[in-house]
Regions:
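Protein kinase-like catalytic core scaffold
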Residues: 164, 236-238, 332-334
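Active-site nucleotide/adenylate-binding loops and adjacent lid/helix of ATP-dependent enzymes
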Residues: 111-224, 232
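Conserved N-proximal alpha/beta basic substrate-recognition cap immediately N-terminal to
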Residues: 35-156
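Acidic carboxylate-rich catalytic motifs and surrounding loops in phosphoryl-/glycosyl-chemistry enzymes
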Residues: 145-149, 242, 320-323
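Intrinsically disordered, low-structural-confidence terminal and linker regions
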Residues: 1-46
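Short, flexible loop/turn elements at secondary-structure junctions
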Residues: 170, 184, 205-207, 228-230, ...
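ATP-dependent carboxylate/phosphate-activation module, predominantly the ATP-grasp catalytic core
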Residues: 217, 221-305
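C-terminal active-site "lid" helix and adjoining low-complexity regulatory extension at the edge
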Residues: 22-24, 28-30, 49, 283-308, ...
């Protein structure tokens, strides 16, 4: 759908929310809608090796015997729709049944996506070239649909650039995203051929991030994950996090070693220390030494406004996680996710009351 074209009206009936929030939906009620299919599906696709590794990790942390840990993990799957990763990352082993019931688990999140997002419109989010075209007014950088261009067009694009960012068209979790220095290649022809061999989807200019975020970690563009939900009254922001790169990689994704910290929606300040998928807490960034908690997100109000406007473009997608880069001039979209991550919403260092 080209930028500027009016989206077709949704055939999906809006849900009745109050305050534009999912709080009206009891997590247990939502889960029960897809309980049987979830259990059967997970049983068939379960990585049992990883399950038993998780049992061992929890055994080491708690001292509980392995059969008891396994039984509790299975019970949490049946009662709350929690996967074994939910159990470990959210530390279900430290929660009461009442606390566990408040958490958005994998099954609950998947059911919300099924209720709120029309699969016919996933294509505008799953493929980067389609996303960039659909949300062109929010992209804020030069880019090329690489499979559709000639070598001459590519040469014209890179002639005044020292480096470029290349991405697969449908990659997730930062996989396949690279920052390439033009001078590292003997010729433009050689670089063009390499990108063709690698099945690159989009080529784009390197974003310059706001100095406030660059000071925190200059090796990657540290993005905001802002999750929106839409109902008949419009768009609403559910929650937001800052994602921070680590280890010198050009991406900040959690699956690529990054960390995350929750943002206060009213003030734009980081509420707690950062946390990563290895369950490590960071008061300061390990490479820059900058204190994370209390940091002010630059251009915060503009970032929120950007995501609310973007949520209007494809109204059939009512539950979206937006990745936003903040440049010195303005926030811009990096991508949109039709299956927003739910786990970062409720990690132990960020939920001192143990309520999800």
């Amino acid at each position: 759908m080209p930028a500027g074209r009016k989206s077709p009206q949704s055939s999906v009936k809006p849900l009745d929310y109050e305050q534009g929030c999912w709080a009206d939906y009891n997590a247990k009620d939502v889960f029960l809608m897809g309980k049987l299919s979830y259990i059967l599906g997970r049983a068939l696709r379960m990585d049992y090796g990883e399950l038993f590794r998780t049992v061992g990790v929890v055994h080491g942390i708690t001292g509980r015997n392995r059969p008891a840990v396994l039984a509790d993990i299975v019970s949490c799957g049946l009662r709350y729709g929690a996967g074994f990763n939910d159990y470990l990352l959210c530390e279900f082993y430290n929660l009461t049944p009442e606390q566990r019931a408040t958490y958005v688990t994998r099954s609950v999140n998947n059911t919300l996506v099924q209720m709120l997002n029309d699969p016919e419109y996933y294509k505008y989010f799953d493929y980067k070239s389609a996303f960039y075209s659909t949300f062109a007014e929010f992209i804020g950088r030069e880019w090329l649909d690489f499979p559709a261009i000639s070598k001459e067009q590519f040469a014209e694009f890179v002639k005044d650039k020292d480096a470029i960012i290349v991405k697969p068209n449908n990659g997730t979790g930062g996989k396949g995203v690279e920052k390439l220095t033009i001078a590292d290649y003997k010729s433009i022809d050689m670089l063009f051929s390499k990108l063709k061999e690698d099945n690159i989807g989009v080529v784009e200019e390197v974003l310059k991030q706001h100095p406030g975020l660059n000071e925190l970690n200059p090796y990657s563009v540290n993005t905001l994950r802002i999750v929106t939900i839409r109902n008949e009254t419009g768009g609403h922001i559910l929650y937001a996090h800052l994602r921070i790169g680590n280890g010198g990689r050009p991406v900040d994704n959690l699956h690529s070693g990054g960390m995350f910290a929750p943002i206060d929606l009213d003030t734009g300040r980081i509420q707690y220390p950062a946390y990563d998928k290895d369950r490590k807490t960071y008061e300061k960034h390990p490479m820059s030494g900058v204190t994370i908690q209390g940091m002010q997100i630059p251009l915060w109000e503009q970032a929120k406004e950007l995501c609310l406007k973007a949520s209007e473009v494809v109204p059939q997608m009512r539950y979206v996680g937006w990745d936003v880069a903040v440049t010195p001039e303005r926030p811009v979209l990096v991508e949109g996710n039709n299956l927003p991550g739910y786990d970062i919403l409720q990690m132990p260092p960020h939920t001192p009351d143990k309520i999800g």
